[in-house]
Regions:
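Solvent-exposed loop/turn and edge beta-strand elements of beta-rich ligand-binding domains
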Residues: 22-24, 38-50, 73-75, 91, ...
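Short, basic/glycine-rich phosphate-binding loops at helix/coil junctions
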Residues: 50-65, 103-111
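Active-site neighborhood of HAD-like aspartate-dependent phosphohydrolases
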Residues: 6, 10-55
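Conserved Rossmann-like nucleotide-cofactor binding loop
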Residues: 22, 97, 147
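Substrate-recognition/cap helix-loop segment adjacent to the acidic, metal-dependent catalytic center
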Residues: 85-90, 94-119
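Asp-based, Mg2+/Mn2+-dependent phosphohydrolase catalytic module
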Residues: 6, 10-13, 105, 109-141, ...
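Short, acidic loop-to-helix structural element flanking the phosphoryl-transfer center
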Residues: 63-90, 122-129
Length: 186
């Protein structure tokens, strides 16, 4: 019998890390889109309508991102965290799968061994609930969205939850708040 070793790090803790506004500077990305040759035509749309237009453009192939094109939108501490934790991290992202996949694959180009869960329009806690037991005791979930944090709390009670506040503002108060992934205390 032959075994392949993919990583020498023993995974003791599993981290589920949100992509937009937790690992990826979505607000700067939206500003960048205003100058993008394809996406720029949608620049005046409010964010919900912008998302619909971008989803359609990715789906029909008129909008794509080159490998690494979006890597500078990955928060610096997020890149270090992902490289350090390797197989102990799963990115998890909500929203149109084609657009999310295009952003994630471009932003993470060059960072090996990172898995991503695309939940589509299913809330992250609801998506993970049937499978959370596979990830050991007390997996960690980090997100900036209150609805995602609440859903995780309601559907996956054993998960340790952190609220990400990249703006340094006060959190909701129900969970520990961090502004950098390096501040995770677990």
């Amino acid at each position: 019998m032959r075994f392949q070793v993919y990583s020498r790090k023993l995974v003791i803790m599993m981290y589920f890390v949100d992509f937009d506004r937790t690992a990826f500077d979505t607000d700067s990305f939206i500003e960048y889109l205003k100058t993008h040759p394809v996406a720029g035509q949608f620049s005046q749309l409010p964010e919900p309508e912008l998302a619909v237009a971008l989803n359609a453009a990715v789906a029909d192939g008129t909008l794509s991102f080159a490998p690494g094109e979006l890597s500078h939108f990955l928060y610096e501490d997020a890149g270090r965290f992902l490289r350090d934790k390797e197989n102990g991290v799963m990115l998890i992202t909500y929203g149109n799968e084609a657009l999310q996949r295009a952003k994630v694959e471009s932003a993470l180009h060059g960072i090996p061994r990172i898995s991503t869960i695309y939940t589509g329009e299913v809330r992250k806690g609801e998506y993970l609930a049937p499978h959370i037991g596979m990830y050991g005791q007390s997996p960690v979930f980090v997100d900036d969205s209150i609805i995602e944090l609440e859903t995780m709390m309601d559907t996956c009670p054993g998960v340790v939850i952190y609220e990400m506040r990249r703006d340094g503002g006060a959190g909701d108060g129900r969970w520990p708040t961090i502004d950098l992934l390096s501040k995770l205390s677990i």
